[in-house]
């Protein structure tokens, strides 16, 4: 693993990498849709929409819900569009506001660390490697979630979706982290679970680790060709020359 020998810092994606946030996100999405009298989506579908930030999540949810409702109305012999519908752009604006309200209530209770995350972060931190977090999640939700999961203490730099002009898969947030840590891009390892993460790493010139257990729009992450592909989070430790315990966090915190 020659590329890993040059690593002097590590940055992580959040949703689908460190945290199983699907329950909380699904609750917020479905409550927002229900409030607008639209069909609810369910977790299996919402998982395929995660990864590009809240605006895109809401666009995907609304597009699906309107199509689903049109199909249901057609099956009942009704016009696909209700004359009383508000314009779609206004509906999207309201949906996003509703989502923010519901997610503020559901984020912490509906989010869980994936197996081995806390112990692995602790081991990397103890080695002296600077750790960073890069997420497309709206910035106001990030710090409270990290605090609730007791992992905020591990990160030197945290970049949320509102902290940059261009979110992943653009390289801007990764290059910003490298700058803040005084590292060359090739010295920063980026760990994520989606093609957005791998594309961002490639564009920034960073080494990448892809994790197979996360949210990747229903497609195999191997198709994105990360530098390394792991099935478990704690595989990072032996890859970086650190001890790996088989008993580390075999269940959610």
UniProtKB/Swiss-Prot annotation:
- Which pathway does this chain act in? Organic acid metabolism; glycolate biosynthesis; glycolate from 2-phosphoglycolate: step 1/1
Q: Give the SUPFAM superfamilies listed for this entry.
A: HAD-like
Enzyme type, top EC level: hydrolase
Q: Which cofactor does this sequence's record say it needs?
A: Mg(2+); chloride
* UniProt-listed GO biological process terms: carbohydrate metabolic process; DNA repair; glycolate biosynthetic process
Which positions in this protein are listed as binding Mg(2+)?
Answer: 13, 15, 193
Q: Which residues form the signal peptide?
A: none
Any GO molecular function: phosphoglycolate phosphatase activity
Q: What is its EC number?
A: 3.1.3.18
Write down the chemical reaction(s) this protein catalyses.
2-phosphoglycolate + H2O = glycolate + phosphate
Protein keywords = Carbohydrate metabolism, Chloride, Hydrolase, Magnesium, Metal-binding
Q: Where is the active site?
A: 13
A GO cellular-component term linked to this record: cytosol
Per the UniProt record, one Pfam family is Hydrolase
The record's section on InterPro entries has: HAD-like_hydrolase_sf (IPR050155), HAD-like_sf (IPR036412), HAD-SF_hydro_IA (IPR006439), HAD_sf (IPR023214), PGP-like_dom2 (IPR023198), PGPase_prok (IPR037512)
Q: Which residues form a coiled coil?
A: none
Q: What does this protein do?
A: Specifically catalyzes the dephosphorylation of 2-phosphoglycolate. Is involved in the dissimilation of the intracellular 2-phosphoglycolate formed during the DNA repair of 3'-phosphoglycolate ends, a major class of DNA lesions induced by oxidative stress.
Q: How is this protein organized at the quaternary level?
A: Monomer.
Stored HAMAP family: GPH_hydrolase_bact
* Recorded family membership: Belongs to the HAD-like hydrolase superfamily. CbbY/CbbZ/Gph/YieH family.
**Designated name of the protein:** Phosphoglycolate phosphatase
């Amino acid at each position: 693993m020659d590329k890993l020998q040059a690593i002097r810092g590590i940055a992580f994606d959040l949703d689908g990498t460190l945290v199983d946030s699907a329950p909380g996100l699904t609750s917020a999405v479905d409550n927002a849709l229900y409030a607008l009298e639209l069909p609810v989506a369910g977790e299996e579908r919402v998982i395929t929409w995660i990864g590009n930030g809240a605006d895109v999540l809401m666009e995907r949810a609304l597009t699906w819900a309107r199509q689903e409702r049109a199909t249901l109305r057609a099956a009942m012999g009704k016009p696909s569009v209700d004359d009383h519908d508000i314009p779609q752009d206004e509906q999207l604006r309201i949906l996003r506001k509703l989502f923010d309200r519901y997610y503020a209530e559901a984020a912490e209770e509906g989010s869980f660390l994936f197996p081995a995350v806390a112990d692995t972060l602790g081991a990397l931190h103890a080695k002296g490697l600077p750790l960073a977090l890069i997420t497309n999640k709206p910035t106001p939700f990030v710090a409270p979630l990290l605090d609730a999961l007791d992992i905020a203490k591990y990160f030197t730099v945290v970049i949320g979706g509102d902290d940059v002009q261009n979110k992943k898969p653009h390289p801007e947030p990764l290059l910003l982290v490298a700058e803040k840590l005084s590292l060359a891009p090739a010295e920063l390892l980026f760990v994520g679970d989606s093609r957005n993460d791998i594309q961002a790493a490639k564009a920034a010139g960073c080494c990448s680790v892809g994790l197979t257990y996360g949210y990747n729009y229903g497609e195999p992450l191997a198709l994105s060709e990360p530098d390394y592909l792991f099935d478990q989070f704690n595989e990072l430790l032996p890859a970086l020359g650190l001890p790996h315990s088989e008993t580390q966090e075999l269940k959610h915190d």
